[in-house]
Amino acid sequence: MSAGEVERLVSELSGGTGGDEEEEWLYGGPWDVHVHSDLAKDLDENEVERPEEENASANPPSGIEDETAENGVPKPKVTETEDDSDSDSDDDEDDVHVTIGDIKTGAPQYGSYGTAPVNLNIKTGGRVYGTTGTKVKGVDLDAPGSINGVPLLEVDLDSFEDKPWRKPGADLSDYFNYGFNEDTWKAYCEKQKRIRMGLEVIPVTSTTNKITAEDCTMEVTPGAEIQDGRFNLFKVQQGRTGNSEKETALPSTKAEFTSPPSLFKTGLPPSRNSTSSQSQTSTASRKANSSVGKWQDRYGRAESPDLRRLPGAIDVIGQTITISRVEGRRRANENSNIQVLSERSATEVDNNFSKPPPFFPPGAPPTHLPPPPFLPPPPTVSTAPPLIPPPGFPPPPGAPPPSLIPTIESGHSSGYDSRSARAFPYGNVAFPHLPGSAPSWPSLVDTSKQWDYYARREKDRDRERDRDRERDRDRDRERERTRERERERDHSPTPSVFNSDEERYRYREYAERGYERHRASREKEERHRERRHREKEETRHKSSRSNSRRRHESEEGDSHRRHKHKKSKRSKEGKEAGSEPAPEQESTEATPAE
């Protein structure tokens, strides 16, 4: 037993438990009490341990580590104040130590009080330490969130919004057109977004029409008239994209006479064409190569004007080979061929190919006006399908405009109105007039029908003018009638005002008299108008006669008018004089009655 404990035991036994003694016991002080050694020997071990237990219950062990000496007597090390020990006394009653954070394996566990602590681990992946067997579930902060069991990234936010078309009784067609609903509209918008971003390749649909030069060689049928190799036939195939099997398997009818391929190369890159057009051009180039061999064998020339052709090039309307008119589109028969005739001499081909003029002439002639004297007239095609009016393409730059013909076997008219036209120059190229392909212009335009149309239109205009005049007259009459009715309505009193039959009779008489007066004045105005009109007509007739006669007649007319004016004046005065005695008679009749 230490000396301090013995001293404290002595002080307790003696009853001197003062504050100074406690301070001396806590912080140390001078030894005032000398303890006899015999007293320590006589004390029982149990008596010494009892105050030790009381001290342990009063002072908590938090922050205090007991170190046992060799003899087994504990040596306390006080590291906290009394206030902290009092506040932690409640926690000591709970046999649970809560540790926040990672606890490494092998860390010293608090095994005091005989129970194992429970570890509340908040971090993911950590193990819950303890031997209690109940696994404590923690909050996983790193896991992705979820709404009603659905991951947060997969939740459709539109489902939380109150859409107007989802309300009961709403008509979906008021919000989505063309048969869309909410889901298909979202899919459509997503597809358009991908197309705009360039993530999706737009396929060439089968509804787009194309006109391709299917056969690159120019052909002439045996029945056509050949003048020193100047008639060349393009074979143009009209159909739809996407049917490469049909187009490649289409047999081409070869004629006896073949010509070099088309004049110009197109600048279309092969990436812009579909696979069907590429396969088509490959077959066309094969045919061109075979026909070139025949052309060289027949004419003995080593090189034709242009035998070079780009591998992916295709002749399409609107590029270099332009056709003046294509009468309609055939959709029923996709493999129908339209044969286009163009004239070209071999010398013109050699001279003109070296430097072709620009693509469009600056003043391309309009197709709806009659042609100038240096252009061939537009052709007539009787066998073309009348589905769509012709689009009207400008003529090609390096050659005279080709013309469509109904049948190749039909004869050609000689000349343009039986006259020869001079060649019209453009740049360095002179286009000669076509002698055989153009029918005469008067045969194409029926002038009598046009004049009939103009005469008919003039008659219709006159008729409409007359109708408008009659309508105006009827309107004026209706206005006068309505005015008269309003006037009568203004003068007419209500039926309750009529007290006697005399008043009603008098009112009717007054109304009739007013109507008669109005009618007389209107007739007078009409007579005056007619007289003025007649005088105008007379003066117009008089102006055509001689001056002396006109003067004489005008004097007679003036005297006649003066005489008439005097006469009318006299008649008016007589009427006024006759109407004045009437009130006097009424007054004289009224006096005897009184």
From Swiss-Prot:
Q: Per the similarity annotation, which family is this?
A: Belongs to the FIP1 family.
A single Gene Ontology biological process assigned to it is: mRNA processing
> What positions are marked as the site Breakpoint for interstitial deletion to form the FIP1L1-PDGFRA fusion protein?
339-340
Q: Where is this region: Necessary for stimulating PAPOLA activity?
A: 1-356
Where along the chain is composition biased (Low complexity)? 274-285
- Region Disordered, as annotated, extends over 1-96, 238-306, 358-594
- Tell me the domain of life: Eukaryota
**Where does the record place the modification Phosphoserine?**
85, 87, 89, 304, 492, 496, 500, 554
Medical condition linked? A chromosomal aberration involving FIP1L1 is found in some cases of hypereosinophilic syndrome. Interstitial chromosomal deletion del(4)(q12q12) causes the fusion of FIP1L1 and PDGFRA (FIP1L1-PDGFRA).
- Give the span(s) annotated as Sufficient for interaction with PAPOLA: 1-111
Q: Which InterPro entries match?
A: Fip1_dom (IPR007854), Pre-mRNA_3'-end_processing_reg (IPR051187)
Keywords attached to this entry: mRNA processing, Nucleus, Phosphoprotein, RNA-binding
State the Gene Ontology terms under molecular function: RNA binding
Question: What does it do?
Answer: Component of the cleavage and polyadenylation specificity factor (CPSF) complex that plays a key role in pre-mRNA 3'-end formation, recognizing the AAUAAA signal sequence and interacting with poly(A) polymerase and other factors to bring about cleavage and poly(A) addition. FIP1L1 contributes to poly(A) site recognition and stimulates poly(A) addition. Binds to U-rich RNA sequence elements surrounding the poly(A) site. May act to tether poly(A) polymerase to the CPSF complex.
| Principal location | nucleus
Ranges for region Sufficient for interaction with CPSF4: 137-243
* Annotated stretches, region: Sufficient for interaction with CPSF1 and CSTF3: 443-594
Q: Where does the UniProt annotation locate this protein?
A: Nucleus
Q: Which gene encodes it?
A: FIP1L1
Q: How does it assemble?
A: Component of the cleavage and polyadenylation specificity factor (CPSF) complex, composed of CPSF1, CPSF2, CPSF3, CPSF4 and FIP1L1. Found in a complex with CPSF1, FIP1L1 and PAPOLA. Interacts with CPSF1, CPSF4, CSTF2 and CSTF3. Interacts with AHCYL1 (when phosphorylated); the interaction is direct and associates AHCYL1 with the CPSF complex and RNA. Interacts with NUDT21/CPSF5; this interaction occurs in a RNA sequence-specific manner.
Q: What is this protein called?
A: Pre-mRNA 3'-end-processing factor FIP1
Bias category Pro residues: which stretches?
Answer: 358-404
Q: Where is this region: Arg/Asp/Glu-rich domain?
A: 457-490
* Compositional bias of kind Basic residues: 542-551, 560-570
